[in-house]
């Protein structure tokens, strides 16, 4: 149990997808203007990562890994296309569910919901799972922790950006300029976790 708690804390803080690996920056910067929208997208990313990482773990271990289907056959060259296909299918299902049951959130996310399909944080989580050879249980914890870490980062950035509306930011830095500086400072803050040994 201690191993799984350690993996969860590590994936949220120490190896944060957004602030340590800088994955998912497109939607991270574009949707982080309001906390409510950021929280909604963060929940969507948590759901997709929590499902996509373990599902792709099963696909990799039961189909794509060397000697998984037939002795001497290695289908790992199909990793990228298969993982992207699974992620795309999951995002389409999530999009239909949000459209049906949560229309305001679906409308607020707009074009960024389909962009979760190509969000490199999702694909990065799946790739790290394969690279680190996580088992099924570890992949569930890692997917959930990575999603929560990404959501924590985008909601924190949105909160800061909402407060910066009332600040006297120099004209040349308004908009994305000050946002990049803020993200850099947040990343420096998260770097302090890198010395933690779990």
Swiss-Prot record:
One of its GO terms (cellular component) is plasma membrane. The keyword Hydrolase does not apply. It comes from Vibrio alginolyticus. The gene is nqrE. Keywords: Cell inner membrane, Cell membrane, Ion transport, Membrane, NAD, Sodium, Sodium transport, Translocase, Transmembrane, Transmembrane helix, Transport, Ubiquinone. GO terms for molecular function: oxidoreductase activity, acting on NAD(P)H, quinone or similar compound as acceptor. The keyword DNA-binding does not apply. The lineage of its organism: Bacteria, Pseudomonadati, Pseudomonadota, Gammaproteobacteria, Vibrionales. NCBIfam families: nqrE (TIGR01940). It is an enzyme of class 7 (translocase). Its EC number is 7.2.1.1. The N-terminus is blocked. NQR complex catalyzes the reduction of ubiquinone-1 to ubiquinol by two successive reactions, coupled with the transport of Na(+) ions from the cytoplasm to the periplasm. NqrA to NqrE are probably involved in the second step, the conversion of ubisemiquinone to ubiquinol. It holds the Pfam family Rnf-Nqr. InterPro entries: NqrDE/RnfAE, NqrDE/RnfAE_oxidrdctase, NqrE. It is found in: Cell inner membrane. One of its GO terms (biological process) is respiratory electron transport chain. It catalyses: a ubiquinone + n Na(+)(in) + NADH + H(+) = a ubiquinol + n Na(+)(out) + NAD(+). It is a multi-pass membrane protein. Its main location: membrane. Signal peptide: none annotated. This is Na(+)-translocating NADH-quinone reductase subunit E.
């Amino acid at each position: 149990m201690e191993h799984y708690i350690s993996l969860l804390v590590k994936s949220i803080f120490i190896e944060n997808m957004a602030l340590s690996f800088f994955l998912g920056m497109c939607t991270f910067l574009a949707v982080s203007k309001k906390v409510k929208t950021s929280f909604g997208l963060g929940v969507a990313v948590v759901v997709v990562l929590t499902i996509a990482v373990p599902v792709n773990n099963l696909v990799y271990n039961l189909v794509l890994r060397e000697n998984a289907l037939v002795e001497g056959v290695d289908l790992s060259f199909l990793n990228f296309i298969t993982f992207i296909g699974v992620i795309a299918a999951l995002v389409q299902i999530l999009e239909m569910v949000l459209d049906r049951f949560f229309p305001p959130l679906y409308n607020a996310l707009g074009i960024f919901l389909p962009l979760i399909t190509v969000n490199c944080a999702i694909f990065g989580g799946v790739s790290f799972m394969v690279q680190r050879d996580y088992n099924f249980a570890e992949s569930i914890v890692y997917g959930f922790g990575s999603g929560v870490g990404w959501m924590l980062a985008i909601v924190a950035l949105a909160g800061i950006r909402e407060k910066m509306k009332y600040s006297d930011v120099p004209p040349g830095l308004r908009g994305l300029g000050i946002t990049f500086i803020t993200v850099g400072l947040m990343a420096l803050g998260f770097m302090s976790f890198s010395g933690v040994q779990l």
